[in-house]
């Protein structure tokens, strides 16, 4: 197999499909993860998925990826705007990563406009709904 990709979903994304569907859509996290795995396989890559509502658990999973994963795709959700610790973890493992958001955070509340990750990310994908996950997998496998 080619690239190994780790997909990390942050807080509240376990509620996909039911939480604010007018913003996040009706696709469940389970369905989204399966779709991403299948798409990665079709490109000759392997994708692992992980979700947590806890910042420390996300950091631990990033650390565990060191030396084992080629690319990280992360939707840090609310931690985008608050977590220097996740930023530091991503910098510390020296794995290229893609920052991903379902909605366009710049069209939402002002506090969502700042990201602690964007300036370190290889790419930022936002505003494409759950289709952004497919785009992220494509970019990760073909370019990183």
Curated annotation (Swiss-Prot):
Pathway(s) of this molecule = Aromatic compound metabolism; 3,4-dihydroxybenzoate biosynthesis; 3,4-dihydroxybenzoate from 3-dehydroquinate: step 1/2
Active site (UniProt): 24, 101
Which GO terms are recorded in the biological process aspect for this UniProt protein?
3,4-dihydroxybenzoate biosynthetic process; quinate catabolic process
Q: Which UniProt keywords apply?
A: Lyase, Quinate metabolism
Tell me the subunit arrangement: Homododecamer. Adopts a ring-like structure, composed of an arrangement of two hexameric rings stacked on top of one another.
Q: Which PANTHER family match?
A: CATABOLIC 3-DEHYDROQUINASE
Give the family this protein belongs to, as stated in its UniProt record. Belongs to the type-II 3-dehydroquinase family.
The name this protein goes by in its record: Catabolic 3-dehydroquinase 1
């Amino acid at each position: 197999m080619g690239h190994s990709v780790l997909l990390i979903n942050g807080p509240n994304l376990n509620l996909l499909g039911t939480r604010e569907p007018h913003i996040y859509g009706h696709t469940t996290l389970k369905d989204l993860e399966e779709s991403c795995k299948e798409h990665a396989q079709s490109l000759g890559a392997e994708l692992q998925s992980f979700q947590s509502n806890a910042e420390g658990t996300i950091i631990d999973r990033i650390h565990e990826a060191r030396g084992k994963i080629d690319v990280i795709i992360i939707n840090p959700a609310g931690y985008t705007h608050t977590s220097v610790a996740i930023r530091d973890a991503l910098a510390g493992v020296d794995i290229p990563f893609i920052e991903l958001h379902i909605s366009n955070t710049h069209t939402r509340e002002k506090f969502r406009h700042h990201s602690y990750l964007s300036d370190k990310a290889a790419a930022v994908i936002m505003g494409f709904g759950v289709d952004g996950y497919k785009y992220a997998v494509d970019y990760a496998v073909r370019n990183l």
